[in-house]
């Protein structure tokens, strides 16, 4: 049967996708619902902690029971999105306000960016990347806070 995959090919493809973190095993509905509130509370704590520099860089999925590794800026973008901000420019502005409140700035090529315009430009670029790449994973894994 040309064009059909056998079990070994399917298993190999799934193994590869899982190894690349492009696929995840999911829990049954009862387990997902049981874990949802605890995951939400943990994720809220992590995103709040990221405001102050945080030490935990993972959000937990109730769907898979697994963690999604994220840097501080991505955690702050996720927090802004999960709080209802829908546009990358809003996330960038939100993160910039947080960084400013701590006297921090973005780094680019190992150098601190000077001024609001340069920092917002970099944050907007990163927010667009987050929207194109990471946000899909957050939604698919039902990560919320």
Identify the residue ranges that each predicted region occupies.
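Long, charge-rich, low-complexity alpha-helical segments
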Residues: 1-145
